[in-house]
């Protein structure tokens, strides 16, 4: 162990508070001093090393805590990846460990370097001239992961294949006019061009794909729709802690996952009852279905191959968020170890959500109604051509909802006039919108009235015709306890209304119900790729809609921690082989949501939002409707 620099004094932060700017700076300094890295070294991430659950649950405000930073560092000269843990209270390097056989994500700093070296390469310049492009500044070069499809003599290299786009005028749609067939291959560690592949000239698509308001004729503005709360919002914020109605939770943000929710609890009477310990995006992967050129390689892991959280948007009032808004800022470290302040990257506000419940009693001619309101916590991320909104909704009745909003621009392939597009669709002259999918995996570390939980699969069951079903209408429900990890890979069965309950068998209400929540999936798909395809070897988690594992603080990502260039490393399919018991223990559920995107002309030049998600609803958690005490609205005739 090594000591360096001055220890940092933190004013009694909560154990889950993200690292401050000074903490991040200290962590970087300590690592650099110990490892003697030169200026070419890169920091993939530096984040809070979250304490063990017990220390979080027993934390008392004002007490001192041990603060630790976790970092992933790339020594580009040696092509070695290291994990570091820094104790911030006494400025000590706890560990600095080489992790053999893995590669880090590609970083924004490398993308900028890559642009410069590719544009100076004579073979690239010559390839552009063959396509009639003389001005190198009219070309955007974007790196794409090679996945597990590298050439045999390049498998030892950390490298990338770049795709190019013609941007005739500043501000044009970057992705509307692909420069097809010209592919620079770049060694990222050495930052040199290995070669420039040219499979032949395809005409540049003619349509610039304008979508900016300053370049189009727009209709008159919509009539004003003002959202006001004269008395202010109902939520209270203390640092990263939020209290809204009966909900309490904490906001977090990490470089890879982006938005994280911690320690969600619901106040029932005089008790704050835990529901979820940690909720986060585990992975987002986008495989394409076109076999042309090198597009068959495209299946980007947006967390595993890029730094998802670093590509977050700064949100704007009136555009991204409406109403009485509270924003959260976070600090992150860039690839060179410099602290960057990210402003307004998490937005929180309330929304009216229509009717919560209503009944008109005809006999007494009396009507009761309550209006629903939800708390919205959201972030938006831009990963190349795609934009993703991650939204968490909390409702007055204890419901939790996750929603992903998919928008941005299509990733396109230029085609010859009259060329057939069996693996996509013609969305504009000369461009094929390639068929693809999006797979989200959400990690939910459940904590229903504590950590000892059990997952139960529930579905409807028809009773066979006979003495027990004389009228043919009888059906009941069937419950199956998921007892061990080997049985923890589960699939939807919409024909039977299948869902999953997470229950605490030691917490029972007066009706005999175990306290629980049920996961209600939304629309979903099965993988389109062949089981033995390169993509499926790396993304085995997409094979099942739900996975259940025993809690392990090191298992945060469905395909494993290090995805870049791997053939298919540790991840959910491997973890469940441990066959750990799952009854009355600390369990994690992982929900995979798949979206099939068959592009259409209406997706060009920019895509209207597609919505996907799931819902968690209390089941037996309360003894009756928990919103009976909600004040009625003021009604007007």
Identify what each model region corresponds to.
Residues 15-57, 107-150:
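Short, non-transmembrane alpha-helical segments in secretory-pathway proteins
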Residues 2-4, 24, 88-93, 97-106, ...:
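Extended effector regions of multi-domain proteins
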Residues 77-79, 84-112, 116-120, 124-126:
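Hydrophobic or amphipathic alpha-helical targeting/insertion segments
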Residues 1-16:
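Generic start-of-chain signal for non-secretory N-termini
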Residues 37-89, 135-187, 245-247, 377:
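Exposed beta-strand-loop-beta-strand "reactive/processing" segments of non-cytosolic proteins
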């Amino acid at each position: 162990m090594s000591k360096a620099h001055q220890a940092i004094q933190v004013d009694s932060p909560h154990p889950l508070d993200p690292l401050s700017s000074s903490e991040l700076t200290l962590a970087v300094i300590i690592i650099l001093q110990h490892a003697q890295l030169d200026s070419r070294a890169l920091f993939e991430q530096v984040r809070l090393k979250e304490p063990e659950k017990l220390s979080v649950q027993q934390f008392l405000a004002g007490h001192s805590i041990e603060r630790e930073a976790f970092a992933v560092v790339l020594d580009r000269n040696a092509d070695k990846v290291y994990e570091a843990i820094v104790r911030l209270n006494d400025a000590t390097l706890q560990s600095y460990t080489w992790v053999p056989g893995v590669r880090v994500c590609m970083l924004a700093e490398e993308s900028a370097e890559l642009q410069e070296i590719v544009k100076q390469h004579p073979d690239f310049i010559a390839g552009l001239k063959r396509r009639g492009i003389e001005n190198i500044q009219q070309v955007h070069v974007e790196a794409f992961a090679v996945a597990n499809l590298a050439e045999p003599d390049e498998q030892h290299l950390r490298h990338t294949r770049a795709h190019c786009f013609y941007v005739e005028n500043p501000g044009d749609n970057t992705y509307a006019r692909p420069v097809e067939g010209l592919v620079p291959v770049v060694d990222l560690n050495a930052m040199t061009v290995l070669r420039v592949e040219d499979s032949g000239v395809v005409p540049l698509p003619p349509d610039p794909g304008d979508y900016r308001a300053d370049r189009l004729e727009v209709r008159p503005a919509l009539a004003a729709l003002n959202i006001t709360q004269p008395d202010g919002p109902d939520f209270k914020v203390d640092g990263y802690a939020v209290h809204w109605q009966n909900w309490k939770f904490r906001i977090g943000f990490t470089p890879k996952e982006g938005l994280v929710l911690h320690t969600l609890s619901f106040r029932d009477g005089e008790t704050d009852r835990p529901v979820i310990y940690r909720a986060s995006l585990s992975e987002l992967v986008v495989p394409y279905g076109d076999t042309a050129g090198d597009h068959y390689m495209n299946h980007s892991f947006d967390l595993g191959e890029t730094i998802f959280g670093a590509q977050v948007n700064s949100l704007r009032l009136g555009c991204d968020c409406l109403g009485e808004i509270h924003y959260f800022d976070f600090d992150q470290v860039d690839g060179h170890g410099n602290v960057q302040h990210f402003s307004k990257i998490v937005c929180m506000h309330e929304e009216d959500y229509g009717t919560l419940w209503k009944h008109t009693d005809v006999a007494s001619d009396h009507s009761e109604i309550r209006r629903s309101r939800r708390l919205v916590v959201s972030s938006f991320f831009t990963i190349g051509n795609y934009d993703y909104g991650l939204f968490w909704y909390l409702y007055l009745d204890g419901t939790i909802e996750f929603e992903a909003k998919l928008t941005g621009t299509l990733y396109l392939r230029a085609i010859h006039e009259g060329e057939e597009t069996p693996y996509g669709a013609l969305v504009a002259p000369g461009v094929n919108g390639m068929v693809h999918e999006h797979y989200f995996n959400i990690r939910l570390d459940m904590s229903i009235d504590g950590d000892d939980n059990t997952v139960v699969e529930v579905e409807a069951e028809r009773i066979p015709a006979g003495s027990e079903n004389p009228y043919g209408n009888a059906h009941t429900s069937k419950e199956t306890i998921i007892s061990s990890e080997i049985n923890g890979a589960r699939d939807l069965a919409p024909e039977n209304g299948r869902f999953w309950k997470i229950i605490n068998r030691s917490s029972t209400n007066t009706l005999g119900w175990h306290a629980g929540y049920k996961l209600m999936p939304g629309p979903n798909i099965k993988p389109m790729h062949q089981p033995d395809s390169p993509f499926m070897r790396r993304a085995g988690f997409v094979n099942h809609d739900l996975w259940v594992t025993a809690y392990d603080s090191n298992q945060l990502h469905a395909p494993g921690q290090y995805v870049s260039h791997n053939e298919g490393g540790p991840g959910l399919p491997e973890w469940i082989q441990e066959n750990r018991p799952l009854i009355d223990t600390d369990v994690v559920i992982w929900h995979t949501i798949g979206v099939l995107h068959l592009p259409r002309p209406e997706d060009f030049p920019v895509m209207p939002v597609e919505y996907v998600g799931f819902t968690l609803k209390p089941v037996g958690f309360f003894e009756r409707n928990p919103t009976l005490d909600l004040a009625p609205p003021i009604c007007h005739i």
